[in-house]
Design a protein with these regions (language model features):
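ABC-type nucleotide-binding domain
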Residues: 4-167
Length: 167
């Protein structure tokens, strides 16, 4: 059970944050409760402008996952703070915060379903046309059309019927 909770009176997200927000990470330091003698992050600072897309890369153990766990407030930092449009994320409702952050993990997840349903997973109410539009935006449409049954092709458990690059 996580001790992290939404504040009793959360601050609403600023209107412009709905279309992208500035991110300011100030002097973050963090230790996992299970490893109190080891700093997972030490004095991390960075600024990301609204609308920018960034990649967090580094060797195993560098703190990439830890940073995202702090951004999503699975933990709070020992020291420092994270601001979205100047608002400390500890002042935001967890639901609002987590809904505005997108993460692309290093390992893909492919469900035991067809291509259409795998894409639709991110937005269950999407129409077939919207799913196809999303595939086109992701430069996957032509590849999917070449599958034996197109969008209805079963991809196998964890995508075993696809190559690593196709996943």
């Amino acid at each position: 059970q996580s001790p992290i909770r939404s504040p009793e009176h959360p601050i609403p997200l600023p209107a412009r944050a709905l279309n992208g927000a500035t991110l300011c990470v100030e002097q973050l330091a963090f230790r996992y409760p299970s490893r109190p003698d080891t700093l997972a992050l030490s004095e991390l600072s960075m600024d990301v402008a609204a609308g920018d897309t960034i990649a967090i890369v580094g060797p195993s153990g560098a703190g990439k996952t830890t940073l995202f766990q702090l951004l999503l407030r699975f933990y709070d930092p020992e020291h420092g703070r994270i601001l979205l449009d100047g608002v400390d994320i500890r002042s935001l409702a967890l639901h609002d915060l987590r809904n505005m952050i997108g993460i692309v993990p290093q390992d893909t997840v492919v469900f035991s379903a067809n291509a259409m349903e795998n894409i639709r997973y991110g937005r269950p109410q999407a129409s077939d046309d919207e799913v196809i539009d999303a595939a086109k935006l992701a430069a996957a449409h032509e590849f999917i059309e070449r599958l034996p049954e197109g969008y209805q092709s079963f991809l196998g458990e964890r995508g075993v019927r696809l190559s690593g690059g196709q996943r």
